[in-house]
Amino acid sequence: MLRCVFALCAALVLALPVHAQRIFENNALRGELVVKAPPEALLNGKPVRLAPGVRIRNQQNLIQLSGTLVDQRLVVNYTLDGMGLVRDVWVLTDEEARRWPWPRTIEESRAWQFDPTLQRWTKP
């Protein structure tokens, strides 16, 4: 009986959710994404196309299909591919969205310094 109690306690401890910090790429930009009719979307109010293999990660870091996000305003971090198509999208949690500053343009990301360990940007 005592073994069962220890096993149950161990299982409960291991089952606790882990709130690990997500790692964003150093070329990720911040913006507001509204998916229209996939692959069409608005990014910061401007029309863009989603790449054919776009990876959209929701707030739990699970892959989500673009069709399930139609007409939702989402605060995101995103990357672009070589053709200017949106390649990776991370839908931000409230805590991640408050992490500031974060570059909104390629020019800002080139001028600012990124610390990959702390996942923080600093302005010059």
Task: Briefly describe each language-model feature range.
Residues 51-59:
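Short, structured beta-strand/loop micro-motifs enriched in basic residues and often containing a Trp
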Residues 2-5, 16-43, 47, 61-124:
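Short, flexible, surface-exposed loop segments at domain boundaries
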Residues 8-14:
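Hydrophobic core
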